[in-house]
Amino acid sequence: MSEHTQGIAGHGSFFQPTHLAADEAAKATEWVRKHVDRRTIDLGERMDDVREHMWELEKEGEIIVHRITDAHKPVEVQTLFGWTKKIPTVQLWHHKSCGQCGNIPGYPTSLLWFMNQFGFEPGRDYLDETDQTSCTAWNYHGSGIGNVESLAAVFLRNFHQAYVSGKQHGHELGHFFPLVHCGTSFGNYKEIRKYLVESAELRERVKKILGKLGRLVDGKIVIPEEVVHYSEWVHVMRNRIAGELQKIDVSNIRVTMHAACHYYKMVHEDAIYDPTVLGGNRTAIGTSVAQALGAQVIDYSTWYDCCGFGFRHIISEREFTRSFTMNRKIRVVREEANADVLIGNDTGCITTMDKNQWIGKAHEQNFSVPVMADVQFAALACGADPFKIVQLQWHASPCEELVEKMGISWTDAKKNFEAYLKEVEAGRIEYLYNPELALGGH
């Protein structure tokens, strides 16, 4: 098979050499270092709000909007353009991340742990079930083997399940509202929602697919009022987390934040900004919970830079992504900020910055920093077990010193976990969540 048949680096056929000049290549990749904030975005002319068109389509009988109701106990936040976005805090349907479950299991576990700590009842206040699929966004962005129609069908299939999932547990349609764990899914779903609202042709095409799958309600597709990311839930719950659950003083911990491009650069008008966080200039996510917990939030010069993952670059240009991660992120937060930890809010970012630090050692670049999600750091501060819940043993970056600096004995936690594993081997398993609920039971 020729290169022009399969595309460069094994990608789809439409990925062909561009032969760009150096200045053209720099312009084409400027998003890597792009600044998206209140200072650099033109806020003068009001952008189109896709939600307004959703209400019109619903009135015309085209779609059903999955609404956030008072039962979801929403908290209103402000986005980049000053628009109001509603974040539900209960009755949540967990839309899991394939990368988190496979590479960073302590990421979703920490989130579920928090809901349990708040007294949320599984099957009533939240649902974590297996009847869902990957968003498949990486297939599209990473390898070029997907298309918008397939992405839209997957989006609608999963959000239909969220809409109807409460029925088998004795609730009404729309009881559980989707909470998206992955930043890539979050950005992809927001783009796809916009395409669906704008294109009658796309809606008709996916309707045929969903009809065959039994994923229509009264012959209509279901689109959520808001696309909500888990870190937005953490943001609106941050004061309750700090006020009700925090057990460890983290005022001596130097925290740096990497905000995911997929969160605030894709469909940037939907990202949360807060005047009490970073002056309201940068997205508040992640930083806000570290700030609420009392940690020292330290700025650094490459805050806006991509983590290095870059969708398909992690597959076909691994050396570039690893060197970018080490030189534009890890080195900077270590040398400029002297960070104790680098937190983030996306699957790909955490994976890239955590798993690739070994490459620095291979090239005698002896700098490293613990990397974890905002919700994992928050869970540690609230007394979650570093091994059973936060699951730092899955991380490749060195987390031992951070844990010790927080006043938690890594050695004792490891011994306790090893003893727990023997209990598991003996069949005495401790569940965070009823496994029958995950499979549709009660």
Question: What are the roles of these predicted feature ranges?
Answer:
Residues 2-442:
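Iron-sulfur cluster-binding electron-transfer modules in prokaryotic oxidoreductases
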